[in-house]
Amino acid sequence: PIWWARLAATPLLGHIFCALIIPNLGPLISRANIDQNFLPGAAPDHYYEQSAVGLAFRPGAFRASAQDVCALSAELAAQAPNYPEILAPAIIITAEKDRVLSPKRHARALAAALPAAELVIAPDCGHMPHQLRPDLALAAIRRVNAMAGVSAQS
C-alpha cells in the first residue's frame, strides 16, 4: 500500500494523522489527485463538487478507506480461488491507461477466471472509464441483462 494508507491505518499515529493533517491537506491536493485518475482524459466539469469528494477527508472515513487499501491485496488473493464458481454473466470494464489499478492484474485476471465474463477495454481512458465513457457502461448493463434473460422493461 502507498505511504499515506499505511500511516493512516497505524493505530495511534494514524488517528493523529487522520484528525489533524488529512482534513486540512486532503482538500488542497485532492483536485490534482482527481485529475490524475482521469488521465489521459480530463475530469468532467464540476466533478469535484458533484461527487462530494470532500467527505473522504473526514477522519473516520479516511482511516477506514486507508485500512481497506492496506487489506486489499490480501483480500483479493483470498477471494481469487473462488472466482471460477461465479457463474453469473459479467462484463468487466477496464481502462486502457489506468494508472490506479493494473488492468492486467485486476480486470484481465478476473475476466479470465470467470466462466461467463466479457472484458471491455475503454481505449484512451484512465481510471474512470464509467465517467468518461458512460456509453460503454450502459451497453454493458444492457448486454448483461440480455445474457441473463432480463428484459429492458424489468
Predicted regions and their residues:
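Conserved alpha/beta-hydrolase catalytic His-Asp/Glu region
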Residues: 3, 22-85
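Short beta-strand/loop motif that positions the catalytic acidic residue
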Residues: 86, 92-94, 98
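Short alpha-helix in the alpha/beta-hydrolase fold that links the catalytic acid
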Residues: 79-80, 88, 103-112
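Acidic catalytic loop of the alpha/beta-hydrolase fold
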Residues: 71-73, 96-101, 127
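Catalytic active-site module of serine/aspartate enzymes centered on a nucleophile-bearing elbow/loop
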Residues: 115-154
